[in-house]
Amino acid sequence: MDKLRLEVERWLNHPNVNWELKQQIKELNESEIQELFSLEKPLFGTAGVRNKMAPGYHGMNVFSYAYLTQGYVKYIESINEPKRQLRFLVARDTRKNGGLFLETVCDVITSMGHLAYVFDDNQPVSTPLVSHVIFKYGFSGGINITASHNPKDDNGFKVYDHTGAQLLDTQTNQLLSDLPCVTSMLDLELQPNPKFVHTLDNEKVYKNYFRELKKVLVINNNNFKDIKVVFSGLNGTSVCLMQRFLKYLGYSNIISVEEQNWFDENFENAPNLNPEYKDTWILAQKYAKKNNAKLIIMADPDADRFAIAELNNNQWHYFSGNETGAITAYYKLNHKVFKSPYIVSTFVSTYLVNKIAKRYGAFVHRTNVGFKYIGQAINELSQTNELVVGFEEAIGLITSDKLNREKDAYQAAALLLEIARHCKEQNITLLDFYKRILSEFGEYFNLTISHPFKATATDWKEEIKALFNQLINANLTEVAGFKVVKVHLDKQTNILEFGFENGWVKFRFSGTEPKLKFYFDLTNGTREALEKQAKKIYKFFVNLLKLNKA
């Protein structure tokens, strides 16, 4: 019997594993067993550890949460004074088992002699609010039980330092290296102390947060606050709080997508939880049509991602993260006086903001992919500079360094609706506003494509290295008829860039699954010509790497 089968048998016969998990184990197929019972330690991705709720060392279950929490607390202990009692915030989103996993995390924290703070009544909490409370209320760190916009059967484990910023790779690698082998998670003995668990005053936290959020506004007037706006929280943490916040700001015509604006752990009326995809908007568009509304705003289930769509000439335009980042930067730099302004974005996000920043005396700081890098960059830069916006090509942004260190749907809603009202005053649309930016700085075309490939090697990461080497060693001087002026592999970020005379395509592989991501940033041409160029380049590389056989 191989090692994995022995581990399966161990789980099936272990007294700490309940009947429900044992039944789930019996229903697993071979590939699921390989994934869930691997003896490797879990991997932290761009936003924590995420996987489906399932048995095994890599499923999200009470054992894996206890194991990861133990490692996290030990890491935070190591960077604090010895024997100091630490304070941790523990929160969860609206997903299944959130309450159970939260209780498990608190049990580990209190067993280790520290204090755990939770929201009253086990209330689901938005990710930006978690970061805010850690940042503002003096916590040693925090654990967020969330899988953000992942499929409904997933859950996750997200960890923060005392500033409310996510831990970086070097820190999570240290966390994992100090943990024993994964097989130990079944035998972890806990002695929880309920006296070490404290509840927060939810109302007090919300009201303080709203007051702080209001400060992100640039021009705080009441013009057009009766603007019709359809809102969906996709059955997540913002379903009540966002509407309450917008009313606090004075908006009087917020139209709620009722089926998607209540806590539903099954997400029955929200089949897709990622606002980046158009099918996520179908129900909200029906509400917009019924109420003759031309704006829809949406937050993903943990309310870090924020998206906005606008009806133009009977067609919906879904603003990308690149577009809202550029719009926010341009608007704020035009209407606010800054001392040493800066923008933070990732290496794969649009360089249009570099041109905007240059005109207004701002600088752009680039980071690796993932908002954890943006959050930590803000920690460093905010000491002597003033944030304009932090954003990435995946929807979502932060507009203030005084609130938190996460993408924040509430900040984004406040500012982008202000900009939408400003456009209404000018008798233009939000899309017109973006086009004016392009008319000043030149057309930019951005596109992100995630392409799966069929891995044949046992270790698909080795196959990834081979593909990258193939691209580098091809010594390409042109791609699909376009001259190559640069080929560069950044060894810190593992992002491979092919530069052209009018922009670039960058490649990045997922750290957790065999997928290759293409990021395009092209300029100097009409939108149609740039889109055509991107498609030609994409097709060339798909054929070169034989990805069409995926």
Swiss-Prot record:
Gene3D superfamilies: Alpha-D-Glucose-1,6-Bisphosphate, subunit A, domain 3, Alpha-D-phosphohexomutase, C-terminal domain. Its cofactor is Mg(2+). Its EC number is 5.4.2.8. Pfam families: PGM_PMM_I, PGM_PMM_II, PGM_PMM_III, PGM_PMM_IV. Mg(2+) binds at S148, D300, D302, D304. Keywords: Isomerase, Magnesium, Metal-binding, Phosphoprotein. This is Phosphomannomutase. It comes from Mycoplasma genitalium (strain ATCC 33530 / DSM 19775 / NCTC 10195 / G37). The gene is manB.
